[in-house]
Amino acid sequence: MSWLAPFAQVECCDIVTIGRVSGKPRSTELWFGVSSDTLILISGTSHSDWRENALANSRVEVRINNVVKTGTARLVTDANERRAYGDVMAAKYDWDGDPSSGLTRQMWCYEAPVIAVSNWN
């Protein structure tokens, strides 16, 4: 069983990235999904510092409750994998979107960039 399994229904995690400009640790609270041993993170906007930081330095720290692990982040580019991860997030979060930014639930679940974190230490 993956270390993530007991946390699959926890609402949020903290992801700590290294600032691509500052070089300093940056912590961001995010919704997340779990698929086997992979943590799923969706960036709802076209610009997201945590996402850009994770892409610049793929070693990220994830904190869920009192458990801290380090993993490798990657941008999900495979369409089938992206759809499967969107399904995980759609099942977990009953959210209608953000009208102020024009982000719909459909866009967030199935079109926004996804970061997958795995290869845990």
Model-derived regions, located:
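Generic signal for short, ordered secondary-structure residues
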Residues: M1-S2, G33, I64, V68
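A generic local structural motif
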Residues: M1-S2, S27-T28, S101-L103
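Short beta-strand segments
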Residues: V10-T45, R51, V60
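Short, basic/aromatic recognition patches
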Residues: M1-C12
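Residues at structural and domain junctions
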Residues: Q9, I40, G71-L75
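Short, structured beta-strand-loop surface elements
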Residues: T45-N121
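Short coil/turn motifs at beta-sheet boundaries
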Residues: A8, P25, W108-Y110
